[in-house]
């Protein structure tokens, strides 16, 4: 009995479990149907189609009988049908709850486990009831028949309960393991499904690409003929492919009658699905299976791959674009062919284009290299000793090299001369170098008897009488100075190796020179149309053709040096600016003395005044050949008046070529004869200089210091002689009545370099400083570099104008408005003994004063005046000379000399210039020594010392005046 009761209990439990399972199944079915109804919301039936999105699902809802009759409008749903049945509220609630519950996958083990658990619970209840019966029975009460039979089954209930628990435990374990396996299998299935789907999509894309490729006529032709590795196809097969291509195209409707895009897409999808799945359904005359096989054969042939690879290498890339985007027009093949032809034509042209570009670059580099080679050749020519003069535009110094030359002393210097303003200027470049072996000088017209070989100025203007100021006046380089002075100048104005430049282009200059450039135009305007013209060797007159020399004064001897082997070449291109290099003139033995007027006219002058134009042509001297002097060729000079220095003695202070014969000695001997003439000329010049007083600031205007009476020591400086000659010429032009008597002899560099201590002249510094034009206007006659005041010109020693002031290098403007002359002999008028700022005072003590006039004030020694008893002496370095306190505190060396400013006085000051009416700006070349006197009194604002010791006269010049 008990066992039967237990069995019944277990059976009832199982039945209950099954009923629960059935109930769950029904619930799940209902929930699925409800979810289907929710999903069907918004589903629309596409007109003309039997199946709409979600319509088929909606019809499964058993609660909606009307859903089967869905109208063509596609707006009906199962939910609406339910509303029609009066169950809208309930259906909606059930649908929402069903949507919220996510159904789990059905697991039978779980269902079985649940059933067993329920049975176990029932067995436990029955066990409890039976235990109660047993307790009643044990208490002595009598049980009913049913109760007694139930208590008899107590042991069976316990056995069933234990069995159920064991079964539930094992089922639970199996269920967990089954779940794990299911998950793994699900992942595998998903992966396989993904691969399968990807393969299908890939196959669809392959089919589309094949169809697009067949739009190319060339491709179709190759497949029809079986060429180029293509599989041979029949026309029927091609027609089949074309049909499939047309039917699988998806198009947007263009009119209301057109099929919708969704319908065409659905049809295309079905065709692709049938093809990729190789369904046996027929398509045209063949099945989809055969159609799929046809596409596979075309792909496996590899023709299409080759077709794309070849165009990339040989043809235009456009071919691949056409075949990849197939428009269905069947024209992409032609485009590809055309593109390939064009590409073939273009590819060969690319190397030629590159070659052309490379050739152009090579030519450019060759041109640059040629210029560099030419530039190097010019530098080599400058460095070699041969004295070949090259065109100025090739020799024009560059700014960088000029700056570099500030640090380096270049032995080879290029002499650049002022260009002639009008016509084709023919600059003469004198390349100065150590004495080379004598060379035959090029054939030249007979030069003037007194040619300044080292003078860069072409005096053809003197012959033509049209000497006009340079059209564009550049800062004058201090032109060729005596060897000793050159070193000093180079320290201040470094002259770099000349580099070729365009014709007519002057190289950039040093800052002092550039400063002068700023004021060059006013100077040019003052000078008028005066011009420098440089003659080539062929244009120069031979000495034989010149007029006979004037009678020489007693004791005045000329020593002629042999022609220098330098060659002068004249470029045909105009030089825009007047340039004087800071080079010393190589000493030269002058030709036998010619007539005084001619000699003075031929003497070198950095600035030619318009007065030369006024001079009649017959008085114009013939051009002088300006050549670099060679120290070796200088003859021994008589009675040295310099400081123990010989003409070629480089150790005299600076290692340079021989000093230039100074014109001073000639003047000294001629002074007495010419004093009356010079006085008369001076008066004439004063009248003429007033209009050109500004010219006192001539581009090379050197303060009286340039004229320091070092001329005994500086006799070798041809620059001094040339300047004096030019000023004499100017004087001669202006005062044609009394031509200055030419010096009979160039006391060659021996005199300048002579070591005679008695003269005390610092011959060592044979440097003709060309004062910057701004210095030109020193107060006294000394002021202007180019002052016409013969006395101001330290060249003017012998000039007949009687300018006593040799102070100015060449004061063309004669004391700016003749103020120097008019103001009590401040400038040029100062007679001997005045503080003539000698560019190179010959005397330390005035001992070399030939006339004894300058003994008092005149000696401004170029180097040291300390020894000179002269009060006014200016020393190049230390103006220890007595006389006024030097204005040049800024000078390189302090000049304690009286009037004399030190060689390098303040450079920038306008004071001296302004006093004299000079430009007024800072000195272009730098006011080298502003005259110790400040240029106020004396004209001595010299190139080196613009000392206003206008009264300082070169010893020789003093006598001249």
UniProtKB/Swiss-Prot annotation:
Instruction: State the protein's name.
Output: Caprin homolog
Q: Where is the composition biased (Basic and acidic residues)?
A: 384-393, 766-777, 812-838
Family indicated by similarity: Belongs to the caprin family.
Which superkingdom, per the lineage? Answer: Eukaryota
Which one of the record's GO molecular function terms can you name?
A: RNA binding
Q: Where is the composition biased (Gly residues)?
A: 869-886, 896-908, 931-943
Q: Which residues cross the membrane?
A: none
| Compartment(s) | Lipid droplet
Q: Which GO terms describe its biological process?
A: cellularization; regulation of mitotic cell cycle, embryonic
Show the coiled coil region(s).
Answer: 109-188
